[in-house]
């Protein structure tokens, strides 16, 4: 215990925290082998729809996936610092944590030139960085023999950003068979939704046709689908042997 905390009537407890962790993760890797091409009709279960032919039309269907022979484990490095502070005889408790996570050599299926005979390759194709803030405040508002009232507030904010992808790869589709879909794109936040937007004038106003907005015909970034922040609070009280509590939560999404 620190000497200045022993008789301190305001700050009676304080703790600083710091941690470091590094974790490796291997993907599912299979040796490349010869795969006998087949014939199919229209489309098949692999993503995306490769050839939009009418149902029943047979066409050449090559094996669609190849594996990088130099595939390396994905590496995650995490740094975390924080503080726990208690005030006024621990009637007010404040906890704060900041974490930074760097993920390198992320393992993705990336698109490849169709001339190779494949659609995608499993390879190390990404680097991502995550910043996170967590704040928790708990206060004993009233304390008596037969009655007490407590309030708790929490706040969390997480920012994910794709730092880089494999050379020549602009974006990687991670979810969604057709648009809209989730993509990882270098230099952008993650996860972002991509889909068809609407035509707008120079002032940003929608261009309408028969009262309806017109499609731009081009895929564009529609915004981040994860909450900009999450927060909540709990309120609880006790009267003799009867206790009651309530919990509220809120997520704010800002595209």
What label would you give each PLM region?
Residues 54-58, 196-198, 204:
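Acidic/polar loop-and-plug regions of large Gram-negative outer-membrane beta-barrel proteins
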Residues 1-185, 232-240:
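Extracellular/periplasmic, surface-exposed regions of secreted and cell-surface proteins
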Residues 68, 198, 202-208, 212:
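Solvent-exposed beta-strand/coil patches in large extracellular/periplasmic or lumenal scaffold regions
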Residues 225-255:
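Glycine-rich, aromatic-lined ligand/substrate-binding cores of catalytic
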Residues 214-218:
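Short Pro/Gly-enriched beta-strand edge/turn motifs at strand-loop
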Residues 161-163, 205-209, 253-255:
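Short acidic/glycine-rich loop or secondary-structure boundary segments that cap or lie
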Residues 222:
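Aromatic-residue-lined binding/catalytic grooves and analogous aromatic/hydrophobic interfacial grooves
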């Amino acid at each position: 215990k620190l000497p200045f905390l022993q008789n301190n009537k305001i700050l009676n407890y304080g703790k600083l925290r710091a941690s470091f962790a590094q974790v490796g993760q291997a993907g599912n890797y299979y040796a490349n082998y010869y795969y006998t091409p087949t014939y199919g009709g229209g489309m098949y279960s692999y993503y995306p729809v490769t050839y939009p032919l009418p149902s029943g039309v047979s066409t050449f269907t090559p094996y669609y996936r190849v594996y990088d022979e130099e595939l390396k484990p994905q590496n995650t490095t995490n740094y975390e610092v924080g503080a726990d502070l208690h005030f006024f005889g621990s009637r007010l408790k404040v906890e704060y944590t900041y974490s930074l996570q760097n993920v390198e050599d992320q393992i993705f299926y990336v698109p490849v030139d169709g001339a190779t005979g494949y659609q995608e390759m499993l390879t190390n194709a990404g680097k991502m960085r995550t910043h996170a803030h967590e704040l928790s405040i708990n206060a004993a508002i009233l304390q008596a023999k037969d009655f007490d009232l407590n309030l708790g507030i929490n706040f969390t904010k997480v920012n994910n950003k794709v730092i880089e992808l494999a050379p020549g790869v602009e974006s990687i589709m991670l979810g969604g068979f057709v648009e809209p879909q989730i993509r990882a794109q270098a230099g952008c936040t993650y996860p972002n939704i991509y889909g068809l937007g609407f035509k707008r004038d120079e002032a940003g106003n929608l261009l309408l046709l028969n009262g309806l907005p017109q499609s731009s015909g081009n895929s564009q970034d529609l915004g981040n689908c994860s909450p900009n922040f999450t927060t909540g609070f709990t309120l609880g009280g006790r009267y003799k042997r009867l206790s009651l509590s309530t919990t509220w939560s809120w997520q704010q999404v800002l595209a």
